[in-house]
């Protein structure tokens, strides 16, 4: 299984190179499906969403399709994913994304699809790949989902936890001591990555790709 777990998407040349190394094709020969449901519940200005798509457009891909699994039937989105090289899971709310991965049935068939495709996660799209969504830590670090009382099982593709947006002014990931305190009771390795960093994962083997900052806990 090949995964590229990012905080902010394809934000620099190093992350772009990692993507095409995983795909094994040139950009102009690569097709991508953009999967946006995590963003649907986020309020306010969506300039970040537009910027994520612009970054993809600037890669000069063969094709960028959009398939919202919360809005269209499986018979419409599945053939498009089967024809793509990259499945790109946009950021937003990780719980909303995981709910629709389950409701749509995509969570069940992703392991088969990923035998031949590359999974790319952006923020929430990266967070859902762990064994669970780390509710308590997410509440502390992102100040969201306070109404939730129970954690949610993730895709369980990786055996670590991914926390995006290190040093972002919008979240509580500005200080290392806050993050360290928040994740101290997590059993397993923790990566906190800024928007210029990513993890390239091939069959469980992890490579850090970064032109920015990142922190690793519980090594």
Give the location of each predicted region.
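Short, well-ordered alpha-helix to beta-strand connector turns
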Residues: 61, 84, 116-117, 158, ...
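Short, active-site-adjacent cap segments at secondary-structure transitions
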Residues: 95, 126-129, 198-200
